Design a protein with these regions (language model features):
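Conserved double-stranded beta-helix
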Residues: 1-53
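A short hydrophobic beta-strand segment most commonly corresponding to one strand
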Residues: 49, 122-138
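Alpha-helical and His/Cys-centered functional microenvironments
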Residues: 25, 118, 133
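Double-stranded beta-helix
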Residues: 41-109, 113
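Conserved hydrophobic/aromatic beta-strand scaffold that supports enzyme active sites
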Residues: 19, 30-34, 95-97, 105-107, ...
């Protein structure tokens, strides 16, 4: 658990969390407690409903990602969709946007496709952030 302060200080889109991505190849969760109201221009959480479910297409994407990752040591650890405006808009149209009042608690399986929404310059979003990421290879006794 940690206090998370996200501050947008310029208009450059250098925040990789704003690209749709899967955190891991297995189920994990993250949660946020909004300390302040979060509007559309405050960087709300976006989530593609049911994207955490395993499908044949998803398995192929994970396999391709793992092969690319094995040959490129500078490759990002999580699978990220390109940040083209066309891809973002298409996904934004179907994403659930968590625009909520303060004291709202949001929990998501981050094996699903998600991102941080865009925010205006000089915007601050304060949350209490929780996450759980177990080792998928641990031996169960």
């Amino acid at each position: 658990m940690s206090l998370e302060k996200i501050e947008t200080v310029n208009s450059l889109n250098l925040d990789t969390q704003k690209n749709y991505h899967y955190d891991t190849f297995y189920s994990t969760f993250k949660a946020w407690l909004y300390i302040d109201d979060v509007e559309l221009n405050d960087g709300p959480f976006y989530y593609i409903k049911n994207s955490h479910k395993i499908s044949f297409k998803r398995l192929i994407l994970e396999w391709i990602f793992s092969i690319r990752r094995s040959f490129n040591k500078n490759f990002d650890d999580s699978f990220r969709y390109g940040n083209s405006l066309k891809n973002q808009k298409k996904l934004n149209d179907i994403a659930e946007k968590f625009i909520d009042k303060k004291n709202t608690f949001i929990m998501a399986n981050t094996h699903g496709l998600h991102r941080r929404g865009d925010s205006n310059v000089n915007t601050v979003r304060n949350t209490i952030h929780f996450y759980s990421r177990e080792n998928p290879f641990k031996i169960i006794q």
